[in-house]
Amino acid sequence: MPILDELHWRGLIHQSTDPKELSEQLAKPTVVYAGFDPTADSLHVGSLLPLMMLRRFQQAGHRPVALVGGATGMIGDPSGKTDERQLLSKESLAANVEGIRKQLGHFLDFTGPNAAVLVNNFDWMQGFSFLD
């Protein structure tokens, strides 16, 4: 069963833009990504749906990319908070990313022809001064 049909069957797609084009794109190997917040060394239940979507896409022959928001995670999400978030140290961030990487390895295959990739936005954003 094509991945798009499976996702519809499971009730995981409410609506999409240009379903015909999407179906054509997903008929060949493509890259999909989901982002994860490394403000803790472990994923939480809110990460389960995007993680399972990455797994399903990988099982269908696509390459999953797990984007860890290391730069944005250092700053934190202030929504719903009255106090300013404390910046994470680079050491804490690295430990959190490593913990998440290990957990992702239980769901995603990081070897093989459509190996999952883990990227960290800290790697390309660390030189920007707004993180200082």
What are the residue ranges of the model-derived segments?
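NTP-dependent nucleotidyl-transfer catalytic core
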Residues: M1-D132
